[in-house]
Amino acid sequence: MIEKYIENELTLKRWRRFKKRKTAVIASILLVVSFILTFAAPLIANSKPLYMSHNGKSYFPAFVDYHPKDFGIADSFYVDYRKMALAEDSLVIWPIVKWNPYESNEEVESYPSKPTSSNWFGTDDRGRDVFTRLLYGYKYSIAYAILVWIISTIVGVLLGGLMGYFGGKVDFFGQRVVEIFNTVPVFLLLLTMISIFKPSLFLLVLISSIFGWMGVSYYARGEFLKNRNLEFVEAARGMGASTSRIIFKHILPNSLGPIITFAPFTIAAGISGLAGLDYLGFGLEVPTPSWGELLAQAHKNFTIAWWLATFPSAALFSSLFLFVLVGDGVRDALDPKMQ
């Protein structure tokens, strides 16, 4: 199905080689499914119904915030849909899990509480549903990892490509800039920034991207150095092509192989990196759902709450394992020895 949209013969060969790696294909499918599930989390786990018909009117609480007065409730500032008195002809459609990632289960005796039919993966030390926080937390992990990868790749390819194409003084000064950035203690800088500014996903992405492009620049520089004097580039120069056209039209598409190869591994490193920061308390602001924060709770409650270690660890291992399988498939597909 996809093959009919691929016009480039080399790209088609690479795609067919990737398809031969069944483990990589299955891992890709599972990752796509996991992306859909986490970004559709409000439809799967929510303390508000997806649809409600009440007193002859239709409501969509999961998508629209309603005032208690809309339901004739005068003695509350919020609507507790679980305890709301409904008419006999009312219809309520709930998500699969009736918890949001921030609310506590007040019906259990103590926190953290073990897995039950109400809380599949148990609750954390504040009574919040672990399954829901894992589902929502994955969205932040993926968003962080992909954003850092995109920004770092763009900056690294741009600067590395310019160093490789022009060489000479541009390459010399560019290399010195890379060396300066490599000497910066990123973790200490991150701690300083968090102590000054309010921790957020944007801040973490910004700092990680500013100091995460150097590795990409090395690969881009090497590829541009190798490709800038090849015959097809010389032919483009002879036909009067501009520098920008030569860089972006001819050299860049033929220099992306190593960069694309490392993309799944880079994203996996981003997921584990954010989990590590959250585990140490330097990541997303509390009470944002986070895998690392759940693992930190597991460390504190290891002897009494095995589920806090088991389920977050399994989620982290599974996601990283799937990205590694995809990365292996991409690496084999783009391997020049397989051309």
PLM feature segments, named:
Residues 123-339:
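Alpha-helical transmembrane segments of integral membrane proteins
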Residues 1-153, 157, 161-162, 301-313, ...:
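Gly/Trp-centered helix-boundary motif
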